[in-house]
Amino acid sequence: IFSEDGLRITAVAGHHRDAPAVIYRVDYKGKSITFSGDIDAHGHAALTRIAKGSDLLVFNAAVLDPPDSPPALYALHTAPGDIGNISAAADVSSLLLSHLSRDIDESRDALVQSIRRSYQGPVQFAEDGLRVWP
C-alpha cells in the first residue's frame, strides 16, 4: 500500500468474524515487522504468508487455549497454540504478544508453554513504553 525511500508497507485482509480486519507488514532497511491485528482462524493463512521471514511478529493474544476462554471469543481471536503454529510456519525471528486480556496476563507461563510446542524463538509480552529496537 506504500513504498518510498526503502520503506514498504504491505497489507492484506485478515478475518475477525464480521468485523473488518487488516494485517500489516512494514519493511525498512533490511528489517521487517508484521502486525496481526485481531484475527480468527480464517485469517491464519493470510497472516502466515505476509509474515514469512519477518524479524518481528506482533500478535494479538486475547484468549487462552480452549476451553479456558469464553467459547464466543474463539470466533474472533487466535488461541496460543495457533499463535505458535503460525509463528513457526512463517519462520519469524521473534514474537511480541499484544492486546493482552487480564486472563492472559495472569496466565503468561501457560501461554508461552503452549506457543513453545511449535515455536522456539523469543517470545515477549508488550507493555507500555516497550522499545523493541534502538
Place the predicted regions along the sequence by residue.
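Cap/insert and terminal regions of metallo-dependent hydrolase folds
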Residues: A41-L130
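Core dinuclear metal-dependent hydrolase active-site scaffold
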Residues: I1-K52, D128-P134
